[in-house]
Structure formats: structure tokens, C-alpha cells
Amino acid sequence: MLVRQLDDILGTDADVKGETGTWASRRLLLKKDGMGFSLHDTIIYPGTETHLWYKNHLEAVYCIHGKGEIELVPSGELIPIRPGTMYALDKHDEHLLRASEELRLVCVFNPPLTGREDHDEDGAYPVLDD
């Protein structure tokens, strides 16, 4: 059984800050854990917009704090996010994630992340080996 506390991850290599300065991802489960998915406690900073397009991964997200919205690209459809909202990017959906308040999101990725990933110029994570 794996048991981790968020406090044990903060300030370690598993506490990743995006180069864009718009998010932080506390990576609770990673590829090396052998679960077949990775699990993240993610903060999106207020007043930010992040372009995301996970071409290599599927992601499910559950909001536990804050408010924001997703804008689907290219349709422009807006989807509000608030506590209790779940969305799943089951079609590798390109989107803009905006936080009007600090968002705290629980995110699951398949295939799992190794922990070293950051978004590329298209907003995607590469698929990395251990």
C-alpha cells in the first residue's frame, strides 16, 4: 500500500512549478508507482490563463476549491469551473484554463507522468520513460 501526505511532497522534486508561472503540481502518484495513472494536487494561480493541449495523455480533473473556466479551442465554448466540477479531456481537447480565483484541482493522467514533465509550446506533456 502506498500512503503519502501532501506535506511530505511540498518542497521536493514532486512539487513542480510550471515554467509559465501559472500553476503548481504536487505529484502524489507517478509512473514509478506502477498504478497505471498519475495523481496530482494542482494549484492554478488566480488571474492566469494557461493554454493546454494534452496530445499524449488523457486527463480527468475534479475541482475542490476556487472558480474559473475552460474555453475550448477552437469552438470558444466556455465551461465554468467551481468546487464539485469534474471534467475529462477524453478527446485530447485543446483548451484555455482560466482561474478567476485560485483553483485547487485533483488531476489524473493516463499514461502516468514520471514527475519531470512541463508543458511544451503547444501546452502538451511529452511521454517520458522513467
From Swiss-Prot:
GO terms for biological process: ectoine biosynthetic process. It catalyses: (2S)-4-acetamido-2-aminobutanoate = L-ectoine + H2O. InterPro entries: Ectoine_synth (IPR010462), RmlC-like_jellyroll (IPR014710), RmlC_Cupin_sf (IPR011051). Pathway: Amine and polyamine biosynthesis; ectoine biosynthesis; L-ectoine from L-aspartate 4-semialdehyde: step 3/3. CDD domains: cupin_EctC (cd06978). Its EC number is 4.2.1.108. GO terms for molecular function: ectoine synthase activity. It comes from the Bacteria. Signal peptide: none annotated. Keywords: Lyase. PANTHER family: L-ECTOINE SYNTHASE (PTHR39289:SF1), PTHR39289. NCBIfam families: PRK13290.1. Belongs to the ectoine synthase family. Catalyzes the circularization of gamma-N-acetyl-alpha,gamma-diaminobutyric acid (ADABA) to ectoine (1,4,5,6-tetrahydro-2-methyl-4-pyrimidine carboxylic acid), which is an excellent osmoprotectant. This is L-ectoine synthase. The gene is ectC.
